[in-house]
Amino acid sequence: MTDKSYHLSQPTYKMIVEENIMVTARDGVKLAVDVYRPDAPGEFPGLFTISVYGKSTQTFDTPPQPFGGSVFEAAIEAGDPEFFVARGYCMVIADYRGIGDSEGEMPGMFSKYEGEDGYDIIEWMAEQPWCNGNIGGVGICYFGFTQLIIAETQPPHLKCIAPWE
């Protein structure tokens, strides 16, 4: 895709941040999420990702990295909330159970809870007044892998996933 005729959407919105909102999983465990959303009324499409590293590590003020650089040169694997929210998306970054501010014990990587917890949070997002119910998964590396696990559970409001790297 070398044609330069594509157009990148322009930033339109400022961002509202709501930290450590607790979402109840199907087994009663409370999962901590941070919500990033446009500062305007209305419903917006959603983006979701879940972190085994702690959601707070995904919003460092990291300067742009050089093209072709390694993923290890960047801190944000979830995607940049400021970029997406400014363009009309709401974004939720969650702590995996037993990690960061979420309750419970971490059952280990690649457990059934990654899919179930992702499903439950996506469906919670769809019920919020700021989300239009169209939700996509985003992220690189482990964040990309968890999208596959979550998609396998077939949340009704998950419309697409975009794992990369």
PLM regions and their residue ranges:
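N-terminal cap/lid segment of alpha/beta-hydrolase-fold proteins
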Residues: 3-42, 46
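A general structural signal for stabilizing positions within well-ordered secondary structure
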Residues: 12, 38, 83, 127-129, ...
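Conserved G/P- and acidic residue-centered "switch" motifs that form tight phosphate/ATP-binding loops
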Residues: 28, 98, 139
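Short alpha-helical segments and helix-capping/turn motifs at coil-helix boundaries
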Residues: 31-35, 76-79, 144-149
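Generic beta-strand/beta-sheet core signal
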Residues: 33-36, 50, 94, 138-140, ...
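Primarily recognizes the serine-hydrolase "nucleophile elbow" in alpha/beta-hydrolase
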Residues: 46, 123-165
